[in-house]
């Protein structure tokens, strides 16, 4: 594997990965140190825990070449590879360890809410899926980044109304108490962890 990384032999590198079939809406938690790649045709939202480092084993992508000092955090390849968990996992074990089952939260008006990432998997961030069908008011206890994954509608808060459509992103400040949605929307809401 080390020689393949040094030579940037992506065919050999990718031969060590098994393809995992995924469906729209599925969530996986990939802990630090687990080598992974995003396959062709996958459109996804990626959340990362706050960290000052990332190990890249692919140095060139889409015409951009990663500077040498950014490849292994200023260290050598042996240090970088020592951070990886090379445990072999079959598909069933991979899904069991990393697939996240949505946790249904109480209904809020015409909004279904599901916790995707929470203290079950990480204490670094939270992620909820919100499905609105009509009008719904969602109380707000944190700043959030909203990402519209389907549909269109409006978001009103603090005397402002925004039109929303698929792929829109909105930062909701901490001081906002309630978010009012209308329309048919599916959103992801990324938030910091709950204070203990």
Regions found by a protein language model. Give the residues of each.
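Double-stranded beta-helix
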Residues: 1-13, 47-89, 186-196
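Ligand-binding loop in jelly-roll beta-barrel domains
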Residues: 33-53, 161, 165, 174-196
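A structural signal for short secondary-structure junctions
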Residues: 109-110, 119-124, 137-141, 146-149, ...
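Short acidic-glycine-tyrosine-enriched beta hairpin
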Residues: 17-29, 157-176
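Hydrophobic, well-ordered secondary-structure elements that form the walls
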Residues: 130, 151, 167, 187
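Glycine- and acidic-residue-biased ligand/ion/polar-headgroup-sensing regions
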Residues: 1-4, 41, 125, 131-158
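C-terminal amphipathic alpha-helical segment
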Residues: 55-135, 140
């Amino acid at each position: 594997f080390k020689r393949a990384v040094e030579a940037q032999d992506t065919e050999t590198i990718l031969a060590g990965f098994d393809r995992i079939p995924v469906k729209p809406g599925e969530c996986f938690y990939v802990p630090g140190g687990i080598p992974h790649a995003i396959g062709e045709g996958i459109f996804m939202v990626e959340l990362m825990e706050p960290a000052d480092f990332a190990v890249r084993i692919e140095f060139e992508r889409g015409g951009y070449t990663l500077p040498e000092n950014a490849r292994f955090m200023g260290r050598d390849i042996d240090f970088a590879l020592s951070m990886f968990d090379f445990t072999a996992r079959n598909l069933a074990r991979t899904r069991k360890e990393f697939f996240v089952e949505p946790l249904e939260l109480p209904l809020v008006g015409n909004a279904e809410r599901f916790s995707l990432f929470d203290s079950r998997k990480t204490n670094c961030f939270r992620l909820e899926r919100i499905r609105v069908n009509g009008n719904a008011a969602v109380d707000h206890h944190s700043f959030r980044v909203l990402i519209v994954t389907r549909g269109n509608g409006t978001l009103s808060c603090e005397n402002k109304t925004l039109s929303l459509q698929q792929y829109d992103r909105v930062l909701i400040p901490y001081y906002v108490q309630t978010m009012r949605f209308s329309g048919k929307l599916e959103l992801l809401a990324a938030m910091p962890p709950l204070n203990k």
